[in-house]
Curated annotation (Swiss-Prot):
One of its GO terms (molecular function) is serine-type endopeptidase inhibitor activity. It is found in: Secreted. It comes from Equus caballus. GO terms for cellular component: cell surface; extracellular region; plasma membrane. This inhibitory fragment, released from native ITI after limited proteolysis with trypsin, contains two homologous domains. Whereas the second domain is a strong inhibitor of trypsin, the first domain interacts weakly with PMN-granulocytic elastase and not at all with pancreatic elastase. This is Inter-alpha-trypsin inhibitor.
């Protein structure tokens, strides 16, 4: 089955006893969250990075979420969709938590959230 289909599954630690920090997609919060993976079995809702998790599982509904820096103190420049302005904007991400309204390039943000006919010819082709 496609990896995207796994996004709806609950995260599964599996029976092994490793303590591997992984990400799973939480459809309720529309965010990728951490869990401890045992290292074997489990299921497909299991990603090595928040980026891979979001890029596989987030939906266009993320575009309507608030822009959240999160509680951590890293200064990572990412893109988010500002629904009030109707456009993708740069914001500073703290490096943990937050939600799915978080994109790794302006292009990625526009592909999810861009409004056709906003003068962006790429979207009209």
């Amino acid at each position: 089955s496609k990896k995207e289909d796994s996004c709806q599954l609950d995260h599964a630690q599996g029976p092994c006893l490793g303590m591997i920090s992984r990400y799973f997609y939480n459809g309720t919060s529309m965010a990728c969250e951490t869990f401890q993976y045992g290292g074997c079995l489990g299921n497909g809702n299991n990603f090595a990075s928040q980026k891979e998790c979001l890029q596989t599982c987030r939906t266009v509904a993320a575009c309507n979420l608030p822009i959240v820096q999160g509680p951590c103190r890293a200064f990572i420049r990412l893109w988010a969709f500002d629904a009030a302005q109707g456009k993708c904007v740069l914001f500073t991400y703290g490096g943990c938590r937050g939600n799915g309204n978080k994109f790794y390039s302006q292009k990625e943000c526009k592909e999810y959230c861009g409004i056709p006919g906003d003068g962006d010819e790429e979207l009209l082709r």
